[in-house]
Amino acid sequence: MKLSEKINKKTIIYPLGASSKEDALHELLDYFQSLDYLTATTKLFSYLSSKDKIFNSVASRGVAYHYHTSIEVNDTLAVLGISKKGIDYNATDGLFCHFILLILEPMNSPNSHRKLINLFQELIKNPTIKSNLLELDSSNEVEKIIIDWENSDNSFDIL
């Protein structure tokens, strides 16, 4: 799997308009719904919010990850929101999150999010790429950085 197969100009919200963790989650879920991947978002928001209270979303180094299974999806889907100002996720390192990744996976593949998170972490661990992503003007430019990274020697595929 290549990162650009899941995160591309169609699935990137740039800039993310949310100013809180809850608003970010709503915005990402609503975006999935606008792409006709979901018919409604209320239950998923409730599940993700309650899961977050128990496990706390993975958030550090300016990145937050949400993931859940859904009966409405047949393939692993992702939407990436990028916030220039950052959002307080109560991260253990105290940093605001600028990159919020929401992954929905089918019921029969409850661990497929791990592959996608690993790929995204490989991209974002490059400090130049990370800072460049916050300076762009559109989701098209974000997609170009992802594709350029994939075409470089620094990326890898995960089966």
Give each language-model segment a name.
Residues 1-159:
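Cytosolic covalent-transfer regions centered on His/Cys nucleophiles
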